[in-house]
Amino acid sequence: MQGTKNNIYTVSRLNGEVRQILEGQLGKIWLNGEISNFSSPSSGHWYLTLKDHSSQIRCAMFKGRNQTVSFKPINGQQVLVKGAISVYEPRGDYQLLIESMLPAGDGLLAQQFDALKMKLAAEGLFAADTKRPLPKNIQRIGVITSPTGAAIRDVLHVLARRDPSIEVIIYPTQVQGETAAQSICQAINIANQRLEVDVLLLTRGGGSLEDLWCFNSEALAHTIYNSALPVVSAVGHEVDTTISDYVADIRAPTPSAGAELLSQDSDNKAQKLATALSRLQQSAKHYQLKQERRLSLLEHRLQRQDPKRTLQQFEQRFDEMQLRLESALSNRLHILSRRQQLLASRLEQQSPKHKLAIEGNRLSYLASRLQDALQDKLSQSEQRIKYAAHQLETVSPLATLSRGYSITTDIHNQVVDSTDKLTIGDSLQTRLRHGQVISTVTQIKPLE
């Protein structure tokens, strides 16, 4: 015992270290489950339990986050949530702090899309150096779409207006439903076997995520990637993005835009625009993927150090204290009510009217003292919370940013505090109160 006394933990230290381990190793996770024990106290925070057939976990979603949820959760509802594991140290319980919540159906499609996107990116299907430029003199375009849809009408109209000399060969296919992805793959393979066109235009009109789901097929992604013919993906509206857009050689926001990219005017401007747009898109996608990974890392680091997390702990603890006080008051009043009934019964048996008056006054006095004590306790708790929030706000880096200051870091995420550390051409990142600015050093001036 003497040799191990330095390894003896306090309860607070143990809970704190468990919290650091869980938060540090798991990070952000997706969780699917059924809601139970849902409650929404006056603070606006949500507390609930997610469970499956054999296990459950406590969850909290604070007011700033749950305002973005488009529906009101109810017990028994299946949902998909994204959040981070944390430990509520005062009680030693681990819980999930929810950041976003979706109904189980839509959420699973979005999660499957993100997972497939990451997998294909890791396999190199989105790499910019694999993208093929469009042919310089396009004579025949193979259009892979439904022959009766609005997309083919838009494509034919644009081509007839811009370059009537272009010949169009339609490879009819399904563009929606369970067998649509297989049908599209077959059409692409047929076009590659015949080699009768210069380029392929894969297109359909807009729709919901479920309507466009066939264009998120892994098999279709590999078919496009292995195509000997260049492929332009023009699926949905401008806001719709599919896996076929990422893996195709060029992505057009709409069917009409795809037809414009493949048709030339007298100055051949469309061809030049398509090449420039392709390079820009691939560069932007590469940069986006890189920044998404970096942002995820920064969010994880900020989450571990964010003073808002501590404030949320205080708010959750305050909610629990308030519920306990309300419960204690209710129990106490119930006990007093039973006691009053007992006294009344005894008085009715003995008819001592003066004792009834004395006990009634004493009961009123006790109720008044109990109410005063409850109010004092609530006031003290509110003052402690406000004081703690103020202390956290004074040391928060976000408070500094809100006063007009900014924080500039280099590419290694090191704070830049002197021009001695800079050279012309360095890339800098400046964090503002709302957003950030990416800049390049073009001139260095010493402080005069």
Swiss-Prot record:
GO terms for cellular component: cytoplasm; exodeoxyribonuclease VII complex. It is an enzyme of class 3 (hydrolase). It comes from the Bacteria. CDD domains: ExoVII_LU_OBF. The keyword Cytoplasm applies. GO terms for molecular function: exodeoxyribonuclease VII activity; nucleic acid binding. NCBIfam families: xseA. This is Exodeoxyribonuclease 7 large subunit. It comes from Shewanella baltica (strain OS185). The gene is xseA.
